[in-house]
Structure formats: C-alpha cells, structure tokens
C-alpha cells in the first residue's frame, strides 16, 4: 500500500497476456470439425449454434498461439487427440476488403496444412453479418471451401 493505494509489486505489472478461448461440449459437439474465429463471444455463440468445438483467438494476428508449446501439448495437438479431421477458419467477412485479416487467414491455413489438417475457409455474404456470430444470429450458416 502506498498513500492509500494498492501497488502492484511485480516488475511490469500483472500480465495475463493474450489467451486462446476453448469452447466445446464433448457430450454434444461433433468433433469432426473444429472452428477457429476471432473473439471470445463469437466462439461461445458459434459453439452453441453449430454444436462443434470452437477456439477463439484474441486477434487474427495471434494465430500462432495455436502452435505454442511443446509437441503434444499445443492447442492443435489437443484437437487432433479429440478426433478432429477438418479445421474451418471463420474470420470476419471483412477479410475480403481488409488485406491484413486476409493475410493472417492465409498464414494460419498454411500452418494448419503443414500440420496435416484438412482446412476449410468459412464464407458468407457480408450483408448477412460481419462475424460468424452475426451470421448465426440472423439464422444462416457459413459455407466453406476446402483448401488443397
């Protein structure tokens, strides 16, 4: 305590860092496909609507967190052990006009393919909503194209 204020004694403060969000219900979800999106609320809502596991990234630039850690302990390894065969990337629909979002999507797709996952890119008409949550709330589902 300093002059009536609590003071963090850790150098640089308390840092939570950017974390991945995992959303799944093993008793209900179809573990064949795993969805990756940006934003916690999109992951929660997407899993509930599509009945498939979701991982939410804190931002599209943080996709490499899926591959952090030792082999066998990474997020991608966890989903492989759950029986996931295809990964569907559902970044926001503005990827068609936002070069940075598109670039990060393509980097993620390439890395997932290096890990031997089948990869699909979720697409929808942007007029139906920017994010997967908007699309689902409007009563629609994404289509996806498999990447070779």
Q: Residue ranges of each PLM-predicted region?
A:
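Acidic beta-strand-to-loop metal/phosphate-binding motif
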Residues: 34-36, 85-99
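Short, aromatic/basic amphipathic alpha-helical patches
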Residues: 99-115
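Short, small/acidic-rich helices and loops at N termini and domain boundaries
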Residues: 128-148
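Short, flexible/disordered intra-domain loops and linkers
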Residues: 64-70, 96-104
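Phosphate-handling DNA/RNA-contact segment within nucleic-acid enzymes
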Residues: 1-83
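Residues at the starts of beta-strands that form the adenosine-phosphate
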Residues: 53, 86, 118
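Acidic carboxylate-rich catalytic motifs and surrounding loops in phosphoryl-/glycosyl-chemistry enzymes
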Residues: 120-130
């Amino acid at each position: 305590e300093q002059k009536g204020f609590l003071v963090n004694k850790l150098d640089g403060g308390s840092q939570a860092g950017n974390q991945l969000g995992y959303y799944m219900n093993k008793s209900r979800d179809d573990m064949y496909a795993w969805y990756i999106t940006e934003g916690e609320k999109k992951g929660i809502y997407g899993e509930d609507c599509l009945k498939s596991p979701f991982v939410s990234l804190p931002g599209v630039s943080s996709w490499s967190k899926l591959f952090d850690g030792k082999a066998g302990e990474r997020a991608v390894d966890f989903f492989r052990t759950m029986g996931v065969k295809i990964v569907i990337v559902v970044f926001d629909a503005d990827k068609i006009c936002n070069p940075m979002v598109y670039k990060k999507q393509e980097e993620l797709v390439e890395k997932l393919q290096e890990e031997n996952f089948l990869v699909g890119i979720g697409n929808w008409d942007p007029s139906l909503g920017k994010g997967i949550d908007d699309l689902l709330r409007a009563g629609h589902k994404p289509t996806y194209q498999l990447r070779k």
